[in-house]
Amino acid sequence: MLWPALRSVLFQLDPERVHHLAHWALHRVPPALARARRPAPVPALAVRCMGLDFDGPMGLAAGFDKGDVALPGLFGLGFSHVEIGTITPRPQPGNDRPRLFRLPEHRALLNRMGFNNEGMEACARRLAALPAAARLGPVGINVGKNKATPNEDAASDYLACIERLHPYADYLVVNISSPNTPGLRQLQEREALDRLLRACVRHLAERAPGKPLLVKLAPDLSPEALDEAVDVAIAAGAAGIVATNTTLSRAGVERHPRAAEAGGLSGAPLERLATEVVRRCYARAAGRVPIVGVGGVMDAEGAYAKIRAGATLVQAYTGLIYGGPGFVGRVNAGLARLLERDGFSTLSDAVGADHRQGGGKAAG
């Protein structure tokens, strides 16, 4: 009950200032304390995916830790995996402030951060200095291109990040779907996507055979474009699909004073759209690669909806902002109850249940 009171105080402050305060605190959590305070894993929620073991489905989405590497503190919150990034080859400040806005009435955030980060060298140094005990689960690294790099040269940026960062990642994600870097989403088009992913997959395979490389897609693609992107990604050798990024849609928040701000919307208003994208990606992939469901996961029911729609793993960011330090523990406890309610002995049994006749009781 303490979190709602603390949140009301923090929400009086600038969102980026609060973000930096949170990182400051998380950085100071020693690995031993993180391990001791971490919520106990629920055996039924364990997942093996892409050759990696996850003690539950709930991970931290890219965007929260942009290379500051506060891994012990983040794993201490209960996340099964943490995705760092987006990281670019060269440091860049991102877009002008203000660039992060809360929409508390809608449990949402609106951001136009623009891949602000200190670059791949700083990220690599921090990860190299991290003790092995700080890694309490798989660590992903989400990579992107610098704003100044034209799309025709984008592959060089992604390859540079893969080259420098792959030794520190359990998996990598090619981010071509942020709405806050001009022209970036054009890389989701068939020919550009095929060229980029084939180059990235080949480069990683030569340096770390078997290490998974995924691609993160936007929720705003047409159904036909989404099907095409999934087909191209799988044909190019991607190990999975991350669905989805933030949306340009303002459905559900049209009347909010911040609705006219540029940027991507995340949180509860994105939940239904993102789940439908997961559903379509799962159907199109037809078991060839796993789907990581992201977007509007604010509670156990939202996470479960994505799992039943086809997500093997689920990630959250905005849900943590609104749900506080106990967020992951509550989601995992709720997922265990929902699995039991629907007669599933393991989480893996529930993945894609909505696509199967007799796949357990109806969600909700």
UniProtKB/Swiss-Prot annotation:
UniProt catalytic activity? (S)-dihydroorotate + a quinone = orotate + a quinol
Keywords in alphabetical order, please.
Answer: Cell membrane, Flavoprotein, FMN, Membrane, Oxidoreductase, Pyrimidine biosynthesis
State the membrane topology. Peripheral membrane protein
* Record carries keyword Flavoprotein: yes
Kindly list the positions annotated as binding substrate. 66, 111-115, 175, 180, 245-246
Catalytic residue positions: 178 (nucleophile)
Localization per record: Cell membrane
* Molecular function as annotated in GO: dihydroorotate dehydrogenase (quinone) activity
Q: Which GO terms describe its biological process?
A: 'de novo' pyrimidine nucleobase biosynthetic process; 'de novo' UMP biosynthetic process
Classify the main location: membrane
> Which class of enzymes does this protein belong to?
oxidoreductase
- UniProt remark on cofactor binding: Binds 1 FMN per subunit.
Which prosthetic group or cofactor does it need? FMN
Gene3D superfamilies, per the entry = Aldolase class I
Q: Where does FMN bind?
A: 62-66, 86, 142, 175, 216, 244, 267, 296, 317-318
Q: Which GO terms describe its cellular component?
A: cytoplasm; plasma membrane
E.C. number: 1.3.5.2
What is the top-level taxon of the source organism? Bacteria
Look up the record and name the pathway of this protein. Pyrimidine metabolism; UMP biosynthesis via de novo pathway; orotate from (S)-dihydroorotate (quinone route): step 1/1
- Disulfide pairs here are none
Q: Which family does it belong to?
A: Belongs to the dihydroorotate dehydrogenase family. Type 2 subfamily.
Q: Which HAMAP family match?
A: DHO_dh_type2
Function of the protein:
Catalyzes the conversion of dihydroorotate to orotate with quinone as electron acceptor.
Q: How does it assemble?
A: Monomer.
Q: What is this protein called?
A: Dihydroorotate dehydrogenase (quinone)
